[in-house]
Amino acid sequence: LTLEFTPSKPEIKLYNLVNGYLQRPDLMAFTGSQRHLISLILRKRLGSSTYAIASTLERIADRLDREVTTGDHHEEPEDYFVEEELTSDEREAFENGPAEDELEANAASSLQDAIRAEAEELRGFAALAHSISVNEKARKLNEALEKGFAKLREIGAPEKAIIFTDSTKTQEYLAQSLKEAGWGDGLVLFNGSNNSRESQEIYRRWMQENAGGDLITGIPTSDRRKALVDYFRDSGRVMIATEAAGEGVNLQFCSMVVNYDLPWNPQRVEQR
């Protein structure tokens, strides 16, 4: 089942602004050999949600401000993206790609005004993204769940769906959006940290219920993952997950997969 959606006028404006920015030949934010890869990831964030691209744009603007203040012009992937926000494919691409170029200090100092102007422009894009509180893609997700669950009821399958997204910012937004649409009961989040308030409460109850048993490994990261999967299996209806749930987690009891964000590698879809 594939559902089409039409972005709102503000979403289209944001897309055009960011896309136009990325097409410029003389960007201050990333001038090195990894520009193409960084641009691809930015477009992925843009396609994920306004919340995902807003935080990324602000992070790039912050790095530009630091560049002017400190004179440190060496670019690293973590200057642009939070580590947890990078998928394994994106991390691998950075690791296997050529090293970033380092600007000469005397050349960079002559471009400080341009760097400041670009940082201000990026913050303007981020402000526009923040102003878009409702994403049309998320609206369509509610319709997709309703149609999907109706089909599951028709064939007698368990009403459980997992939604995959690349961004924890998008994950947080979708959780709030689905709660407002009436999907709050049985909603669970799964990501690399699993430290949301709801996840911590599920983990606390799971530890109490299994105290003295052999399910508890004593490894908090592993036990948190197990607690969330058990909750989803026994009580949940919808899990919103990042790539962390795509590997090494048994979710065969789940009846429906929603690819909210598509991965670069088509094999990832099969793994999901």
List the predicted regions and their residue ranges.
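Inter-lobe connector of SF1/SF2 helicase motors
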Residues: 1-121, 180
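Glycine-rich phosphate-binding "P-loop"
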Residues: 120-147, 211-216
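Conserved SF2 helicase motif VI
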Residues: 265-272
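Conserved interdomain hinge at the start of the Helicase C-terminal
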Residues: 14-17, 21-31, 132-168, 172-177
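Conserved helicase ATPase core of P-loop NTP-dependent helicases/translocases
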Residues: 188-242
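A short beta-strand element within the Helicase C-terminal
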Residues: 249-261
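Conserved helicase motor "Helicase C" RecA-like lobe of SF1/SF2 P-loop NTPases
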Residues: 59, 167-201
